[in-house]
């Protein structure tokens, strides 16, 4: 279970304190799939970072009784001066997983070939996303965080990613941030709309989109 209890997040800017999330509360059970809608700047990515544990909330509490992934295809945590393989080894140590399995899976799934042995700073954005997605799936989690529908290059590779995540791991929990109505209806059970840091919950996906589309 993930329990978000009266969570707020604010940052100190040059103009003073800016509140990004206001008193957000919701619960997510194991196996549940939730979609999050919101305009740019609504606080979606901030909420994802808080749920994953990358950042703490300013106030409130997030309780987790299941393992949670980092945002899929997020490559911001890679050390650019290290090779893809060195980054892989580092992640294996952090999560205490079998390096031989993760290496074999990543080599096959990412299709990066010898680039795995090159510094990540030389990768294109698509190559970084491939490595990040492969590592996200090589380390098994109870809940996967997806910030926007999978976009990692060619459609064949994207289809492979979707099969691994939504078919082979269809028993897992998912929090999906997306602007795509079709993706939400296909992959999620219900939806929440973030508007200027405030959360509105909907059990009916169409009503969530109706409200979302009414926003200025």
From Swiss-Prot:
Catalysed reaction, written as an equation: ATP + H2O + capsular polysaccharide-[capsular polysaccharide-binding protein]Side 1 = ADP + phosphate + capsular polysaccharideSide 2 + [capsular polysaccharide-binding protein]Side 1
Subcellular location: Cell inner membrane
Membrane topology designation: Peripheral membrane protein
UniProt KW Cell membrane keyword: yes
A Gene Ontology cellular-component term: plasma membrane
Function recorded in the entry: Putative ATP-binding protein, and an energy-coupling component of capsule polysaccharide export apparatus.
UniProt-recorded name of the protein: Capsule polysaccharide export ATP-binding protein CtrD
Naturally occurring in which organism (per UniProt): Neisseria meningitidis serogroup B (strain ATCC BAA-335 / MC58)
This protein's encoding gene: ctrD
